[in-house]
Amino acid sequence: METGSPGKRPVLPKRARLLVTAGMGMLALLLFGPRLVDIYVDWLWFGEVGFRSVWITVLLTRLAIVAAVALVVAGIVLAALLLAYRSRPFFVPDEPQRDPVAPLRSAVMRRPRLFGWGIAVTLGVVCGLIASFDWVKVQLFVHGGTFGIVDPEFGYDIGFFVFDLPFYRSVLNWLFVAVVLAFLASLLTHYLFGGLRLTTGRGMLTQAARVQLAVFAGAVVLLKAVAYWLDRYELLSSGRKEPTFTGAGYTDIHAELPAKLVLVAIAVLCAVSFFTAIFLRDLRIPAMAAALLVLSAILVGGLWPLLMEQFSVRPNAADVERPYIQRNIEATREAYRIGGDWVQYRSYPGIGTKQPRDVPVDVTTIAKVRLLDPHILSRTFTQQQQLKNFFSFAEILDIDRYRIDGELQDYIVGVRELSPKSLTGNQTDWINKHTVYTHGNGFVAAPANRVNAAARGAENISDSNSGYPIYAVSDIASLGSGRQVIPVEQPRVYYGEVIAQADPDYAIVGGAPGSAPREYDTDTSKYTYTGAGGVSIGNWFNRTVFATKVAQHKFLFSREIGSESKVLIHRDPKERVQRVAPWLTTDDNPYPVVVNGRIVWIVDAYTTLDTYPYAQRSSLEGPVTSPTGIVRQGKQVSYVRNSVKATVDAYDGTVTLFQFDRDDPVLRTWMRAFPGTVKSEDQIPDELRAHFRYPEDLFEVQRSLLAKYHVDEPREFFTTNAFWSVPSDPTNNANATQPPFYVLVGDQQSAQPSFRLASAMVGYNREFLSAYISAHSDPANYGKLTVLELPTDTLTQGPQQIQNSMISDTRVASERTLLERSNRIHYGNLLSLPIADGGVLYVEPLYTERISTSPSSSTFPQLSRVLVSVREPRTEGGVRVGYAPTLAESLDQVFGPGTGRVATARGGDAASAPPPGAGGPAPPQAVPPPRTTQPPAAPPRGPDVPPATVAELRETLADLRAVLDRLEKAIDAAETPGG
């Protein structure tokens, strides 16, 4: 029965065609609509922040890569398909009913162009899209320069290895992909059309199929020869000897490197043998050549280096690896700036020889000892300075310094941000959440070396109003009062770490012209945002786009949105910097500062490389846990520079990038790629520069490397005997390493306060102190590292040993039992400070937090005790422990009377009065004002008095105390009823 005219294609009815067209349109909209919306929003946002040129450059680079790779891959694959199709044989299978590919062949024959072009273009576009992620390599290759340093093996400039070689490898990989795809396409096409037939006995190839497949197979092998050639250069970043060292070792240079040349020659011969199949019908020659290449790769490329490593290198590793370890040491020091030009080493005995009060440097250090721990006091800040339930502080506060009345003082600082997660009830309504509760309020700081009053007693210590920070508040309320210790002219915070935790993260500000303010400012005032930040949604098109992006129809129908409305997005300071400078790696800890009356976030940014020859690999970022629970290591780098300091204005979100390392060739490359995006170092305001801190992420990498790379002699490096270790955190049960700490210490030359990031180091697999590393943050000496090296046979205890000694002290243990009855105990930063002309002072604040008996009650930590410890001058590792409510009393216990006065001489210690204009805990959330007067600071030290006179005065004082005791007893007896 006939169903239609022979050869006539069926035609869909008009209605069916319309439905199919509409369905395909809807599918395309679903697939590409969200991406188009994202592109348009990015266009608007990058224009708002003034970095649209970055977005355009990245987009054009990626599009160029897509076009180039797609064109090459599609062209090669299409050529392969076309050649195979045009050279197909005219054959009819002996048994057509058993031909498995007959239906597919018929379908292809009906639309050969569609299949050919469709397959080629699809493969090309997919490959192009994947390759577009290599845009960084392309930009580095195009704009890369030189380092002025050559590698020790080939004599090439380092720029070749970090700018050129990755690009060459990427190009080679995509050519390899294109040729392999073309080979597979040729193979399948010839099989489909009979050029390749598989019978029960043997396979059969037509001459055209043999020639085409041989050419593509030869091209694959030829590309493999090029890959072997490039492998030679990549040996300089070999990981064969890790974790001992990174880079080419003896085996790599004397076995792998020659093996690569041998394999290059064999691969070229193998490729030639494949090309001979064009003229020779015998395929045994290319088959034998391919077998030779595989066998050579196993024997020459694998077995030979393995045997050399096992039987020649390992038995004599210390000697044969010596020159290569030396290369690794020199390259690592250069790549991470831990060489002699940046690190100053000093011998340090570890035992004090003088009283701290007699050493000018120590007088400064003791007066500035930090007692407040930013990791512990966030909840205290929140409870006492929250004001409203929807305000909060970051989980970890920050440390910075300010010069108040000519005196440099370090502060624990935080921004009172809006916390979207804390909104409750009707506050979470869309209108309230996104148009009313839009910003935070104020900058809060507390001097890091003192609290409002010393906590006395142990039974009810949490009920006392003591041990709390002395707040210097700069917010809306204090703006007009003139009581700001740190003046802030614009205290409103629209951009921050906490405020950006909303999902989705956006706030809608502004409205119709002349409309009443609606943003919550204070209990008695509303506010309308006037900053430059934000993307306009005053027109219906933009409103529709954002409604689509966040899947919220209220963008279209809300009367709160007018012609002057804007939406604030990407409000996390770190994220903003990452988006405008995707070629930078940002530090994990942005911190707020006040500059010229404005709250500004400072974000440290790094230029990094992962192919610096011979440089040790390190993890710049901590482990990352995926949503599925898989933990992977952070970004591995072999070169890092803190080349950029970025700022984000907390009010209008303005992002500014400042050059901070003129000598960094990587930054110079990126500045050529994105001209005008990074301001020169000369444009950094002095007030901003004064708040730059040495970044923690960089310091942690450098200290872990200095633990090994302070060793100069390769043989000693190989034995690891002189290595150090980062100590474990004695206050953390998670077995984490001790975090570095910011401190103000006395400068060795001037005795003036110097802001530094520091860390103790212990011996390799030992607990005794081996070194003390500090990084300068002061503008004049920024970036210089100082390493105090203790003798190798030192008995100076390290952090863990000191912690054990302090908590096992009888006074500490006995009072701890009392404190734990109704409190949780938190140990703060264990600070290690050089002191006493060769000694080390350990200081650790102890916080207590009342155990809550009611779910509705809130508790928060307070400073209760101060522990200090120093090594005994004339004992084999013995220590003195001080334990008291104040630092002054603790110091007197370990150094004798008089040292404690140094701690209060400049307003330090637990019982110091607040500075003028500083606010105590603010009501109603704050703790009430102290009920008792605070003890005055100790008087300044007078002239020296002879010891005999001191003894006589002490005896007289003792007699007077005895008389007073008897007098009090007599009074008590007289007042006792019936007495």
UniProtKB/Swiss-Prot annotation:
GO cellular component, as recorded:
extracellular region; peptidoglycan-based cell wall; plasma membrane
Q: Identify its membrane topology class.
A: Multi-pass membrane protein
Pfam entry (one) = UPF0182
Segments carrying the region annotation (Disordered) are 898-948
Compositionally biased, Pro residues: which spans?
A: 913-946
Which InterPro entries does UniProt cross-reference here? UPF0182 (IPR005372)
Keywords assigned by UniProt?
Cell membrane, Membrane, Transmembrane, Transmembrane helix
Q: What is its main location?
A: membrane
Q: Where in the cell is it found?
A: Cell membrane
Which ranges does the record mark as transmembrane? 19-41, 63-85, 114-136, 174-196, 208-230, 261-280, 285-307
What's the domain of life for this entry? Bacteria
Give the family this protein belongs to, as stated in its UniProt record.
Belongs to the UPF0182 family.
**Listed name of the protein:** UPF0182 protein Rv0064
The species is Mycobacterium tuberculosis (strain ATCC 25618 / H37Rv)
Q: What is the lineage of its organism?
A: Bacteria, Bacillati, Actinomycetota, Actinomycetes, Mycobacteriales
